[in-house]
A protein has these predicted regions:
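Acidic, polar-rich low-complexity tracts and alpha-helical solenoid repeat scaffolds
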Residues: 1-256
Length: 256
């Protein structure tokens, strides 16, 4: 049907996914769709959806790579796939998907980059919540000389791959216009620096950068709390006292 009428691709996908509820159909669906991709490569989108629904996430990833990233529709498809992997707690594969997107997309849209970086931050945070000590971080261009050094500040830690990854994220953020998405990315990076690296000064820098990126009021409140905590944890007690002390021209009441 879709060979002659591509508009039925979504309909065909839905019908095949319903058929996949019966596990006895899996072999037939797999073999039929694989054969069909030779005639019509667009069938790969159905095959990737089938693999995803049946929990074959690595195979779904392979199909998405074969489809490629050739236009904005592909960009949206890839980011949705990476986000869904993260929601399925497939964090390592999700991180790999975000990295693949960042390495292979040719559409330098700040919103796309912001969403990918935000997704990475959330995937890392999921790893923090699930495993407090043994974390796996995927390296993305660990030896990166594309950006000038003034865009980044080296981290004083022994985990060089992680340090280079964070530096690379900072260098990208330095080139992106401020937006709500970049504000969240800065906030997430600050949490990684504080919770994993115990780099409270670096985390404070990230939180302050987040404040400059047009955050909403809810995020502003979270950032302000984090900045105060970082000052205390870094031993900057005099500065933290000034930070927490209300200004003299502010009316303090029970709601303050």
């Amino acid at each position: 049907l879709i060979f002659n009428q591509p508009q039925f691709l979504r309909y065909a996908t839905d019908r095949i996914l319903v058929m996949s509820d019966d596990t006895t159909n899996h072999f037939l669906i797999d073999s039929t769709l694989n054969a069909a991709t030779i005639v019509d490569p667009s069938v790969r989108s159905i095959l990737s959806s089938f693999f995803y629904k049946t929990g074959q996430f690595n195979k779904a990833f392979d199909e998405h790579k074969l489809i490629g990233i050739n236009n904005q529709e592909d960009v949206e498809r890839w980011l949705l796939f990476a986000n869904n992997l993260r929601k399925e707690d497939q964090n390592n594969l999700s991180i790999e998907a975000y990295h693949y997107f960042l390495e292979n997309q040719n559409f330098p849209n700040p919103n796309n980059l912001g969403e990918a970086l935000l997704g990475l931050g959330k995937a890392y945070e999921n790893q923090i919540d699930q495993t407090k000590t043994k974390l796996q971080f995927v390296k993305w261009f660990p030896q990166n000389y594309f950006f000038e050094k003034q865009f980044i500040r080296p981290f004083n830690i022994g985990n060089e791959p992680l340090a280079n990854t964070l530096e690379h994220y900072e260098s990208i953020l330095a080139l992106m216009p401020s937006s709500y998405a970049t504000g969240i990315v800065h906030y997430r990076l600050g949490q990684i620096q504080a919770r994993i690296l115990q780099d409270y000064i670096g985390a404070n820098k990230s939180f302050k950068s987040a404040l400059k990126s047009n955050p909403n009021q809810n995020l502003i409140n979270k950032i302000n709390i984090q900045i105060g905590e970082m000052l205390l944890l870094s031993g900057s007690f005099e500065e933290s006292e000034k930070y927490y002390k209300p200004l003299t021209d502010i009316n303090v009441n029970e709601n303050t």
